[in-house]
Amino acid sequence: MHTENARDTLKQMSKVTGKACVCFNLRKASRLLTQVYDQALKPTGIKVTQFSLMMAVAGNSGTTMGKLARPLGMDRTTLSRNAKILENKGLIEIGEGDDRREQILNLTEKGVLVLEEVIPIWEGVQKKLAEKMGDQRLKELMSDLRDLVRESKH
């Protein structure tokens, strides 16, 4: 009888958490948006996660893996695994830093060319989202997300 009551309680709680849990809803939105971007980028052979990493490398040329991981909200192991995929595609190069343990990231010429192809597609997806949500709502969402990230670090 106790298990039956627990199941009913959990069923009700699952409805509440689905509506109220920040993490659940952000992850759901992230998965769905990832699908939208990945579908648009499919002809380029690049996924949106790879695009994000390549743009971070482009904006921080010659930086170390450790320094790049922090602003991306990634641990170094995950970043290293994702960077290796891009290196295997010839899109970035991973070099040795002053300290042999340091790994330096740079875009390759092929990586630059791929980004030149991907950016207009990414901009198109951004534009469609802005049209659906409205510019103001999208700006507010982005501001709220930055606030959430900042507050989560404390």
Locations of regions flagged by a protein language model:
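Residues within helix-turn-helix
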Residues: 65-66, 77, 84, 103
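N-terminal leader segment of winged-helix/HTH proteins
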Residues: 1-44
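C-terminal regulatory/oligomerization modules of transcriptional regulators
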Residues: 1-15, 136-154
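Pre-recognition alpha-helix immediately N-terminal to the DNA-recognition helix
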Residues: 32, 36, 52-55, 113
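Short, locally clustered residues in the helix-turn-helix/winged-helix DNA-binding domain
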Residues: 27, 55-59, 119
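Short capping segments at the starts of secondary-structure elements
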Residues: 60-64
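Key DNA-contact positions within bacterial/archaeal DNA-binding proteins
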Residues: 49-51, 77
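Charged, amphipathic alpha-helical coiled-coil/dimerization segments
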Residues: 34, 84-143
